[in-house]
């Protein structure tokens, strides 16, 4: 709904915001990547891999990632599963994620939140105690 130039400008601004957030704050997971705020997925995933940030594979919003699957996998980033369940009947339902993993040959050792693999998160105690410095 906007010009190509405007779209590219928005993608650049959004991408820079994601990169800055990962550098400045103890981010653990990027959720809904490319769902509403379009970004350069490859660049964001490369930074996420570098910073130890998971990228969510969201049951409801996988369509936003389909065309970027190869770049995401090639970046080396780890993934975490999210069902986006807004209904208790949908909790734990990951069939679309399983299909995505199979379709794009996502290495299962890099997918957390399934197969009993729990993600690990950064300790935020020091960050919280020193938040005024940020």
What is the predicted function of each stretch?
Residues 1-4, 33-36, 58-62, 84-88, ...:
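Active-site beta-loop-alpha junctions enriched in small/polar residues
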Residues 1-53, 100-112, 121-134:
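Extended substrate/RNA-proximal surfaces in nucleic-acid metabolism proteins
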Residues 9-11, 59-76, 125:
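Short, motif-level signal for alpha-helix interfacial/capping segments enriched in acidic residues
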Residues 29-31, 55-57, 79-83:
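Hydrophobic faces of well-ordered beta-strands that scaffold small-molecule active sites
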Residues 37-44, 64-68, 91-95:
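Active-site-adjacent beta->alpha loops and helix N-cap segments on the catalytic face
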Residues 71-74, 78, 99, 103:
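Short basic/hydrophobic patches in alpha-helices and adjacent helix-turn junctions
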Residues 90-92, 98, 109-116:
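Catalytic core of soluble alpha/beta enzymes
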Residues 77-92:
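Short acidic/histidine-rich active-site segments
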């Amino acid at each position: 709904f906007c010009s190509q130039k405007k779209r590219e400008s928005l993608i650049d601004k959004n991408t820079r915001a994601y990169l800055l957030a990962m550098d400045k704050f103890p981010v653990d997971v990027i959720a809904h990547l490319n769902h509403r705020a379009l970004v350069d997925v490859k660049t964001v995933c490369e930074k996420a891999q570098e910073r130890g940030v998971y990228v969510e594979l969201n049951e409801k919003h996988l369509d936003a990632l389909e065309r970027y699957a190869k770049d995401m996998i090639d970046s080396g980033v780890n993934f975490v599963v999210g069902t986006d369940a807004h209904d208790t009947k949908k909790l734990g339902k990951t069939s679309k994620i399983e299909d995505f993993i199979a379709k794009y040959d996502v290495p299962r050792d890099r997918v957390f939140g399934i197969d009993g693999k729990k993600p690990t998160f950064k300790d935020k105690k020091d960050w919280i105690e020193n938040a005024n410095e940020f």
